[in-house]
Amino acid sequence: MIIPSLVFSLLAAFAMWVFVRRNPATDPRVTVAILALLLILPLLNFLPKYSVSVEGSLGTSTSLSPSILPSIWTLGFLFFGLRGLIDVLSMQRWNRESRLANDLPAFQETLCELAISRRVDLRIHPRLTSPVVSGLIRPRIYLPESSTDWSPQTLRMALLHELGHVQRRDLWMATLAHIVCVLHWFNPSVWWLRRTFLSQCEYACDAHLVEKGTDPNIYANALCDVAQSASAPPLSLAMAGHVPLRERIIFLSSGGRRGSAFLSSLIFLTAS
């Protein structure tokens, strides 16, 4: 199934590249559906197989030496699977290193604004540089220590963005995308699709906030205040890191279309 999965993922990646160029906020669920199909493809190997023996003058067939491909795949699978486990453990460490901040008024207000009834924790982490959300069963939003110095408007924008990921269940889809990458670790198209999915999640959250009435210029300023380069585990989503800040502000300023040179200049003025 290696060749079919390579061909399918390459064609799917090309199709997504075309769609994303036209609209970076293309629904991430489309990309996840493609990745889910790639997850199902290996299961076809377990379907019954039928072979027809042909008698002829070919002589006795010689046994082939076992292929090393399954062994190589297993090594890669174990390597990337172990990395995923380490990332899960690191998120548990984040929880121990941070302090709970659920009583923050802005947090309670944004929960009510988005009508989120499930349990979500807000925590302050001393070593983070940008907001991060993680957790499937009990989502947790981690803010950097510097968030105590943010303006009320910037804090509200950051919370709305991270809660948007919770509301859209992006973390569940991100976990599925990571599992597919572990199974298809040898396929660069799959990794590209996952990276595209993460970018789509950020663009979609940005677009959703603007559609709900958030002023794009105010939100762009909040991004400039908050979004520093952040490295987050694969099973979490960081407000910065997946999409360059400049690209996101151009997207906001252009109303969901690719920016022009004029808009690019506008971005630098906004960011400064």
Task: Put a short name on every predicted segment.
Residues 1-272:
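Membrane-embedded and juxtamembrane structural elements of multi-pass membrane proteins
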